[in-house]
Structure formats: structure tokens, C-alpha cells
């Protein structure tokens, strides 16, 4: 039986409600949110990365590699026919194939690369992110031999799971099986990552998913569900997916539609999103009002994202339009005689190009205020080592001078995950270069009381109805950024211009903009800490009063 709808691989990691809206005929003319510029740039970067990989493969394999034509004037049906002919001819390597539609299974789509094994084809995905980490155990093969039978256990790499990649590969595997072109035996599939030096191989039949499931089993369950959701929408049946707020909502083109509906119904996911919202609805709590009516100290059900009592208080805060409430009457914030606020700026996974600092407190023979340690060589580059070494040397000197004067010292960041990653990563990448500290020294610092994560304190001391991000919390403390477009996603675009990444001359105005943005970030954590330590904090609503 032919399926009424054919879905691509993206649906299995997409919100169920979005799948419904994309296939509901009545929603075709509804206004959607404009494309996110940062998201569009990531897509463009990924396209360029795939082009670089295809060029490398063309140099390696010459006439053995066939590229399926692609463009706005080329119909998908024509691309599918060319791909089918190439597979029937046994072409060793097929770039950009549009796989035959699985009309019975309801599948459509393509993959970046097909490689011919002795008994059939194997799908390979090309992505612009890391597919492995330092370690051992990953099965890899060199780019010059991108076949699973050439894979060996890599002594220097361990697999970075990347569930989305595995699900996309599972979709292609099912298409190949339906068309009769899949390699016989165990389902293996490969990924070429950001470094593009090896193929990392995934066993799609290995029980590596939660509960001992395989990637194929996980994919099959998700795809079956999304196919049912899309089919019901296309037929005009009762929807199988209702709006519910999740993390991805903020970048979804359908958010304006769902936002209106969620607020109209005062849906409980406006306060407790994701799995917690599902659990609450099952327990009969569907609205923010119903959640606010629950009794503190008598949890109805256990929640995953937060304690039940916190959810109740957040619901009451939401009804009063309160952004932040404090958990306790007295608040403790670690302070010191000499304080440094630190903020790191990175460009995706490629490198950390700036370490900004705000020095305040007692005199240590250093000018108080802002300083930045930056490189304007496009990352990754060896000049990162210089800027990181200068930052670490300066920070260490301030600590030592404070100690010599009998003064206490603390450095602060907001959400240490990013800073810690690049502190340790930079020490590891550049070890042995001038001024680079040993990894053990960096690890000792980040584990010490001298390194304070303000995000962790905010999480412990406040309940936040609209998120805990610095851009949300600092304005409550009275701080504002000078740039109305300040934000991590926008800074990615500014950085591209600042270093001339797209072939244009480096833009000095964007460099100044990034420096100002970074300065405001460290000033924001400084202002937030001062506010949390002041008497003004008592003016903030107290959770106990709600």
C-alpha cells in the first residue's frame, strides 16, 4: 500500500507538532517566523564544507566518483532517476544522490555519499561538526578508502555519538533496503566530520541507545510515529500532535503559530516544558493555572527538569508576570578582595578567539576595568595560543599579587561549561608552546574556590520564569547591553566579518563591536554579582510569599 505522505530524514528529530503543521493543508498560507540569520549561516557553512569534501573525493577517485546534478532548475524526480541508474551501473562512489522514494514506507530524501561495497551500497554523511573525541575505540577508515571493510579500531579516537547523525543514516539505510541496493549483512554507515580526514563508522544494529535499543530500532519507532502524525494532518483527521513548548521552539518557523495557541490555552508547557509537560498533562494538569493551584510540599508526580515545588512556584510567578523570584530570604554570593570577571568568545567548535576580563576590587598594581586578549587570525590558528597564553599569564599575575598582599581572589564566569572546555582544550591543544600552562594547572584552578560559576549560584538562588540566561537575568539587576543585537548567535556573524572569513577585507568596525559586546558581558556578571550582594535583592519577590 502506498503511503499518502513521503517524509525526509529530518522528521525523526523534529517536533511532532511541527510535522503536523508542515502537512496540514490549511496551514500552507500561515505567516511564519523569518529564517534565523545565524541558522542560515550555519547551513551555508555546512554546504561549503560538503563542497570541500566532494572536491577532495574527486581528487582521490577521479572518474570513479559520479556527482548527481543539483540546482534550482533540476527536478527531484530527475535526480532520483539519475541516482537509480548510477546504482544499477554499480558506480563505485556517488556524490549527492537522491535516493529512490520508498512509496510503501513513506520515505524520501538523499544522503551526501554512497560507497559501493561488494554486495551493495553504504550511506555516508558529511557534517560540519566533530564526530569523535580524543580516546580510542572508534572504527575509522581513511578518506582514501571510505568503506566499512577498510575500517580499523582507531587508537586515537573514540566515537562522539551524535544521535541526529545516526538517525539520518538509518533513514538512508531503510531507503536503500527498500530499493534493493543496501549492502548485505550488518547495517554499517559512515560519517565524515569537520576535520574530514577519516570516516567514522557506526553500527546501526549495535545496542548503543538507551535501553539497549539500536539506532535502526530507535529510528523505526520515531519514523512510524511521525508518519502517523503527518498522515493525520494531510487527511484532516484529528491531530495526533498538539502544541507544547520545547527547547527548539525559539528557532522554529512555526513558533508564532504555536505561541499564540499556547498562550490562549495557558498551556502548562509555558512553565514546565518537554517531558515534564507531558507528565503533568497525564496527571491532569494541563494549564499554568492548574499547576499554580497545586500544593507546595505535596508533589503530585516527580518531574525531570525541576523539583515539583519549583514548578508550582514558577507557575504562580508566571501568572503574576514575574521574571525572577528568589528562593531564600538571605542570599550568599562568594566575594573577594580582588575580583576578575571572565568571558570567552569562540567561533563554533573551531577555536576561542577572545578572553575578556573585568578587574575590580583592591589595588594590585593593575589598571581596573576591561581588557581583552584576542586573536584576529581566523580560528583555528596558532595565534590562539598567543592570546590564551597572554590571558593566562595576566590572570595568574593578578592572583599572585593578591596573595602577596594578603588579599583574597576570585574569578567569575557565567556558565562554566564553555569556559572550562576552552580553558582545558587550549592548554591541551597548545601544550609546549610559550606561556601555555600545564593541563593539570588549569584543572586545579577550575576545581578551586577561586573559580566561581555565577550561573550555578543563579540556579540555586532564583526561580526564573523566562530562563536563566545572562541576557535574561542581568536586566533584572538593572544592566543593559549597549548593542541592541547583542547575543551569541549574532556574534558569530560579526566574527566572520571581523576576520574577513567570507573573502572580504577584515572589518575593523565589527572587531570593535565584538570587543564592546565582550566587555558588556563581563560588566554584566559584575553588575549581577553586586546586585545579588546588595540590599536591593530584598526588593525581589520571595518564593515563600507565593
What are these regions (language model features)?
Residues 1-119:
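Metal-dependent nuclease catalytic cores that hydrolyze phosphodiester bonds in DNA/RNA
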Residues 2-3, 19, 131-132, 258-259, ...:
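Flexible loop/turn segments at secondary-structure boundaries
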Residues 40, 44, 159-163, 236-239, ...:
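Generic amphipathic alpha-helical segments used as scaffolds and interaction surfaces in large
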Residues 72-77, 293-297, 307-308, 484-498:
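Short linear loop/turn motifs
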Residues 92-104, 108-134, 142-227, 372-490:
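Conserved DEDDh/DEDDy metal-dependent 3′-5′ exonuclease domain
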Residues 165, 171-175, 185-265, 473-546:
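Acidic, Mg2+-coordinating catalytic module of metal-dependent nucleases/exonucleases
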Residues 258-272, 276-392:
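C-terminal extensions
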Residues 294, 342, 360, 412-415, ...:
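Generic beta-strand/beta-sheet core signal
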Amino acid at each position: 500500500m502506498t503511503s499518502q505522505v513521503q517524509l525526509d530524514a529530518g522528521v525523526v528529530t523534529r517536533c511532532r507538532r511541527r510535522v503536523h503543521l508542515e502537512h496540514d493543508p490549511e496551514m500552507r498560507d500561515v505567516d511564519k517566523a523569518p529564517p534565523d540569520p545565524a541558522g542560515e549561516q550555519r547551513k551555508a557553512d555546512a554546504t561549503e564544507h560538503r563542497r570541500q569534501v566532494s572536491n577532495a573525493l574527486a581528487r582521490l577517485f577521479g572518474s570513479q566518483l559520479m556527482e548527481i546534478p543539483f540546482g534550482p532548475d533540476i527536478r527531484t524526480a530527475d535526480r532520483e532517476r539519475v541516482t537509480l541508474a548510477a546504482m544499477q551501473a554499480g558506480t563505485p562512489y556517488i556524490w549527492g544522490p537522491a535516493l529512490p522514494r520508498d512509496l510503501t514506507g513513506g520515505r524520501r530524501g538523499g544522503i551526501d555519499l554512497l560507497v559501493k561495497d561488494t554486495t551493495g551500497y553504504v550511506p555516508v554523511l558529511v557534517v560540519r561538526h566533530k564526530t569523535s573525541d580524543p580516546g580510542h575505540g572508534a572504527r575509522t577508515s581513511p578518506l582514501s578508502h571510505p568503506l566499512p571493510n577498510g575500517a580499523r579500531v582507531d587508537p586515537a579516537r573514540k566515537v562522539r555519538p551524535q544521535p541526529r547523525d545516526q538517525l539520518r543514516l538509518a533513514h538512508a539505510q531503510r531507503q536503500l533496503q527498500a530499493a534493493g541496493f543496501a549492502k548485505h549483512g550488518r547495517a554499517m554507515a559512515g560519517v565524515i566530520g569537520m576535520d574530514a580526514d577519516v570516516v567514522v563508522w557506526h553500527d546501526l544494529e549495535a545496542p548503543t541507545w538507551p535501553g539497549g535499543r539500536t539506532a535502526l530500532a530507535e529510528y523505526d519507532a520515531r519514523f512510524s510515529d511521525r508518519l502517523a502524525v503527518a498522515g493525520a494532518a494531510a487527511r484532516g483527521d484529528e491531530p495526533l500532535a498538539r502544541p507544547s513548548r520545547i527547547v527548539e521552539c525559539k528557532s522554529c518557523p512555526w513558533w508564532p503559530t504555536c505561541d499564540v495557541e499556547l498562550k490562549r490555552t495557558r498551556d502548562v508547557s509555558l512553565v514546565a516544558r518537554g517531558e515534564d509537560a507531558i507528565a503533568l498533562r497525564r496527571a491532569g494538569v494541563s494549564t499554568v493555572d492548574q499547576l499554580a493551584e497545586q500544593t507546595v510540599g505535596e508533589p503530585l508526580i516527580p518531574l525531570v527538569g525541576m523539583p515539583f515545588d519549583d514548578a508550582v512556584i514558577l507557575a504562580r510567578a508566571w501568572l503574576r508576570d514575574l521574571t525572577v523570584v528568589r528562593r531564600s530570604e538571605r542570599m550568599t554570593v562568594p566575594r573577594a578582595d580582588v575580583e576578575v570577571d571572565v568571558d570567552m568568545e569562540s567561533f563554533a567548535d573551531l577555536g576561542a578567539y577572545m578572553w575578556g576580563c573585568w578587574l575590580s576590587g583592591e589595588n594590585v598594581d593593575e589598571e581596573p576595568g576591561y581588557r581583552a586578549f584576542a586573536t584576529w587570525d581566523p580560528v583555528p590558528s596558532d595565534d590562539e595560543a598567543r592570546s590564551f597564553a597572554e590571558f593566562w599569564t595576566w590572570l595568574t599575575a593578578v592572583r599572585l599579587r593578591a596573595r602577596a598582599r594578603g588579599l583574597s581572589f576570585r574569578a567569575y564566569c557565567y556558565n562554566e561549561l564553555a569556559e572550562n572546555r576552552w580553558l582545558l582544550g587550549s592548554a591541551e591543544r597548545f601544550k609546549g608552546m610559550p606561556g601555555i600552562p600545564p593541563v593539570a594547572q588549569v584543572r586545579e584552578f577550575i576545581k578551586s574556590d577561586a573559580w566561581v560559576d555565577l550561573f550555578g549560584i543563579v540556579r540555586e538562588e532564583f526561580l526564573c520564569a523566562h530562563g536563566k540566561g545572562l541576557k535574561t537575568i542581568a536586566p533584572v539587576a538593572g544592566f543593559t547591553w549597549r548593542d541592541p543585537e547583542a547575543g551569541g548567535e549574532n556574534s558569530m556573524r560579526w566574527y566572520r566579518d571581523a576576520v574577513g572569513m567570507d573573502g572580504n577585507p577584515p572589518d575593523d568596525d565589527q572587531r570593535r563591536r565584538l570587543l564592546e559586546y565582550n566587555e558588556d558581558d563581563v560588566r554584566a556578571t559584575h553588575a549581577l554579582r553586586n546586585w545579588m550582594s546588595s540590599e536591593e535583592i530584598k526588593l525581589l519577590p520571595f518564593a515563600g510569599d507565593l
